[in-house]
Amino acid sequence: MEKRKSIFFANDSEDNTSSGDLSSFTKRGTITPGKIANAREGELSQMIDVESEQKYQEIIELLVTGGYFRARISGLSPFDKVVGGMAWSITASNVDVDADLFFQENSNIKQKVSLSEELIKALNRMKCPFPLQAQHITLLNYITLFPIIRWLITKVIETREETGDLLRMYSISMFSKDYIAPIDEDMKKSLNESCDFIESVEKRYKPTRKFKRANNTKSTPTQTLLEYGKLHRISRLPTNINENKEAAQKLESQLSGKDGSGKDTTEAEREEEEKRIKQMMKGMKGVEGDALSKVSGGVLKSFLPSEEITNLSERYGDMSDLGGAEGAKMMAEKLHRQKITNLEKLIQQKNQELEQIINAHSERQTELEQLQLLVGKKQAFNERIIRETEKLDALETPENTKALQALRSLVLLNETLIAQEELFKQSCKRQMVEYKQKIEQLLSQDASTQEDLQDSDRQQQIQQAFDSDIGKLKKLKLLLNKKNRDISLIQRYLDELPSRAELLQYQRQFVELSEQSSSKLTETRQYYTTYNTFEDKKTLLENELSILNSIQSKYSIAMSSTNNKELFIKSMDQIIDGIQQVLDKSENKWNVEKVRHDTLSDQYMTLLDQERNYYKLTKDFEEECRKNELLIKKLNELQ
């Protein structure tokens, strides 16, 4: 079996044990074959692998929770599960994806890239808030894909709820077209009955016009009520209206405290109101007569019954005479209502003031309680200090008398120092105020004192020092900019160097490309072999056809005589011998190829066994290494 060349390493011999790492690929001086380049990078890649595995499990759980149960199939690859789940989520969110995922598994890298681009286009149409690139999908970057799949599952659930509501409404509407629920039927009957009742009430009690106003008369609310026969109800006042009037006058006199002025104002208002009402009644009487002259008796009977017409004529005939007294009664009642409203407003205002006073009292009460609590705490503290001093005095003995005296002297010294510190602070503050005043006085002096030669020399020195410092600052800024440029160049160079995770991705990508190229090479060889086989078959069929044509053309001539027949038979024997030789060669070649195929199959099975054994031994070795690390850790803890 021809060994495939590696695209990663220069030395591809079987005894080279460093083909698993990327030392010769990276060309770094600190990395040597057979050793790990950097322990921190190894730990980082291991942490990334653990986190990626955890995110992969969470993605599968999210897809199953969302309803994509195909992710439970253990025979599918992670790419098919994750990308299939993403496509299913996008389709379930009512967004189309131009890809066929359900009948094509284990795609090559070109199909994966095209599929990833279609998914990214669909996510952009959905306005996904998370950035995504095609390499994240093809290389299965689970850490980047996890928030996107979580967002897609939430979209699926929202779309499912919306479609569920729409389907529920549609089913209810379709049911309502052919059937009616018992509750709806009872409600419809009661609604129809109530509507009929309301219509009958509206028809019975609707307002009807009973009189007509003159055209040259100005429209007022009172005249409009009179047209519809509503004003006559105002005349039906209770018999005790005088009593109410007297009570209102008494209440007004008690509130105002001015009997004479209140009465005069009320009498004047009453007289004015009586005059206005009399004038309006006279106009309405003329309008009534005019209306009676224009409206016929039959039309009026159609509006009102005969008894109602008689009563109205009697009432409105006497209204001109009784209009002043009734108007005064109405005015008194109106004034009474106004006084009541004013009293209610005054009561409401006083209540608000009372609430404000109560709130202020409660605030003062809380402040008083806080002060009482503070005083109680101070008193308790003083009592505790007194008790402690009494205890200390009781504990005083001839042995510790000197120590207590020394302690008392130290306490007194501390208190005196504190008092001196306060006095010193106060004196410093006073001096600071005095110095500030002096400085202000000096600054407010004449400008001639500022033009002294010494001050000018000092200003020149300060200016020179300032200029020199500015020059130094510029030089330092130039050096800093140069250092920043160097740092940025080094940083850019370091950024261009691939990390171990990127190198692992590159290696995986190169391996996939190598596998794809080898599969294409195998496929091309199969095409060539098939073509050669068909070409040989075509040649044999052409030879057979030519032989059959020659036999057919010479058969009649050969059968004409015995000599020709013998020659014909000999030529046929030669042809058969040639065909037999070709057949023998083909059989020998087929046998050789079969033996080679069997040998290669045996070698392949042997290699598969070795691979299984290698993976098993590697796993056992890792387990033993882990146990060894645990034992070393425990040993270190015991030491």
UniProtKB/Swiss-Prot annotation:
GO biological process annotation, one example: Golgi to plasma membrane transport
InterPro entries: CCDC93, CCDC93_CC, CCDC93_N
Top-level taxon of the source organism: Eukaryota
Segments forming a coiled coil: 332-492
Keywords, in A-Z order: Coiled coil
Protein's UniProt keywords contain Nuclease: no
One Pfam family this sequence matches: CCDC93_CC
Annotated region (Disordered), positions in chain: 250-275
UniProt feature, compositional bias: Basic and acidic residues: 260-275
Family as reported in the entry's similarity comment: Belongs to the CCDC93 family.
UniProt name for this protein: Coiled-coil domain-containing protein 93 homolog
Organism: Dictyostelium discoideum
